[in-house]
């Protein structure tokens, strides 16, 4: 079976990790989060462009290794810049993995309340980071599906399963 490379992308706090975990469980895939990679690679994050490049380079390296061993991979990150998304396209092409891109979206008031309620999460993103990213997020031009995570977990799960063809 051909491995999949599924990039779950979107603004901070929209619920990417929730959706990515669901996909990883259903696909028996390795879940790779930029938040976790950053924690592994950087002791005191400053979120500079150089640091972002380092984190995404390591993310793609880990994905390449997993795909090389025959595993599917779910990537969880903002992928704020088109260049990072293009690297996912290139990786899929180089490894022969089937690429999917899922944009997770959520209404702003819901995001802000979820960010305020976060505890014990690898993400450092706060409400100001969310608002800043919202202003500077490159539009997604790649073919993609969208999941609206503004509602209940059951509604989000149903959308994810519909994308995978599961009911």
Language-model segments: what does each one mean?
Residues 8:
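Hydrophobic anchor at the beta1->P-loop junction of P-loop NTPases
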Residues 11:
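P-loop (Walker A) phosphate-binding loop of NTP-binding proteins
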Residues 14-71:
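Conserved substrate/cofactor phosphate-moiety recognition/catalytic segment
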Residues 5:
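Walker A (P-loop) ATP-phosphate-binding motif of ABC ATPase nucleotide-binding domains
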């Amino acid at each position: 079976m051909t491995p999949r490379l599924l990039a779950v992308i979107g603004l901070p706090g929209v619920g990417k990790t929730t959706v990515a975990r669901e996909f990883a469980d259903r696909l028996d895939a390795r879940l790779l989060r930029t938040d976790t990679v950053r924690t592994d690679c950087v002791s005191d994050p400053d979120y500079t462009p150089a640091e972002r490049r380092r984190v995404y380079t390591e993310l793609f390296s880990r994905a390449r290794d997993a795909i090389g061993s025959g595993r599917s991979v779910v990537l969880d990150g903002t992928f704020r810049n088109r260049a990072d998304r293009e690297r996912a396209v290139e990786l899929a092409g180089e490894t022969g993995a089937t690429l999917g891109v899922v944009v997770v979206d959520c209404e702003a008031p819901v995001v802000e309340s979820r960010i305020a309620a976060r505890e014990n999460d690898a993400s450092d993103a706060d409400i100001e980071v969310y608002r800043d990213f919202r202003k500077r997020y490159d539009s997604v031009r790649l073919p993609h599906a969208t999941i609206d995570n503004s509602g209940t977990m059951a509604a989000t799960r149903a959308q994810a399963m519909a994308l995978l063809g599961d009911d």
